[in-house]
């Protein structure tokens, strides 16, 4: 069994083996974190007991001391070991304790920077892909042929339709404005009538109150007068009846003078009954007069109430008409505002359409001008190309003529050399951009002396002549001194 403990940078180990097994050496090292045991000065201490075997102590690489003992008849004990206290003191390695934290922070920062760098790389790749995509789109749009479309008739038709709609809206707005004016005039008339009716109603109510007071007073006076008249009438009737009775009695008394009649002049009249009867009559008359007055008053009140109800109904109808007119005015005002807004929108749309049409027309004109310029340039380029082509064709024709002339000259020279003809002078003139004409003249019978070629631009002819004269120069006098004769 092996046990290890760390204390102050040193390690102590002890090993014991029990049983009949051979002794084994146990080497222990005292490691220090981050430092190899071979560079440190730390040492280890170990002890070993072997039962049934003996092995001498040995010193290992860990600077430990070992001792061996024999387990036999001796008591099982561990020998005393001396320890150097200086070895137990911690070593001053001058290492910053925050170095590990700093290294960890540096590693984290490096990881963060690596992550940011990877993100930047991904972003750069994405932007490169976007750039490639945009370049592809740009090339596609550059290579795509733009189709010419004549949009001017469409815009003109649309603008004309909008103008017709605007005219219809203007006509509707004029009609609605006239209707609004008519409705406002009607409303003013109804308002004046309503105000007049209100003032008339107030005047009528005041007159009704005054008349009611007068009627009440007149009714009371009439009742009093009727009662007085009734009483006076009854009293007059009563007095008349009394007078008639007395007159009749007197006449009968006068007519019967010869007859002595014993009369009882004590008029035995029951005045209480007469008064009670008259009072009853007066009460009856008063009650009938009161009933008639009440019935008349109720009739008048009913008539006045009916008049008030009729005027109230008329006023209610007038108010309903006024409210209806107000609602109509509000509706017409809203319709007019809506028509104005729609007219404004249509005018704005017409203006915008006109602007867009003008812009499209201007753009079309610019494009037409550009196309005309490009067409003119293409025509000029074509004319230049045709001119160059004509010049090239002329040059080709001249070269063909020269080649033909040279071939004839060579054939003639070969024939002359073969036949032994006299000397031949050759004068060649080339013309740039024109048709070259050549005159071939062979003369003389003398042996061949020399052959001369005049390559100067004399008159545009290729001439073969005698050695005495250059035919083109002699004929026209236009040689520039290129030939020897001239």
UniProtKB/Swiss-Prot annotation:
Residues 106-417 form the IF rod domain. The keyword Aminoacyl-tRNA synthetase does not apply. Keywords: Coiled coil, Intermediate filament, Isopeptide bond, Keratin, Ubl conjugation. Coiled coil: none annotated. InterPro entries: Growth_fac_rcpt_cys_sf, IF_conserved, IF_rod_dom, Keratin_2_head, Keratin_II. Residues 270-413 are annotated as: Coil 2. It comes from the Eukaryota. Residues 142-151 are annotated as: Linker 1. Residues 107-141 are annotated as: Coil 1A. Pfam families: Filament (PF00038), Keratin_2_head (PF16208). Signal peptide: none annotated. There is a cross-link at residue 212 (Glycyl lysine isopeptide (Lys-Gly) (interchain with G-Cter in SUMO1)). Residues 414-486 are annotated as: Tail. PROSITE patterns: IF_ROD_1, IF_ROD_2. SMART domains: Filament. Residues 253-269 are annotated as: Linker 12. Residues 152-252 are annotated as: Coil 1B. Transmembrane segments: none annotated. One of its GO terms (cellular component) is keratin filament. Residues 1-106 are annotated as: Head. There are two types of hair/microfibrillar keratin, I (acidic) and II (neutral to basic). Belongs to the intermediate filament family. Heterotetramer of two type I and two type II keratins. PANTHER family: GATA-TYPE DOMAIN-CONTAINING PROTEIN, KERATIN, TYPE II CUTICULAR HB3. This is Keratin, type II cuticular Hb6.
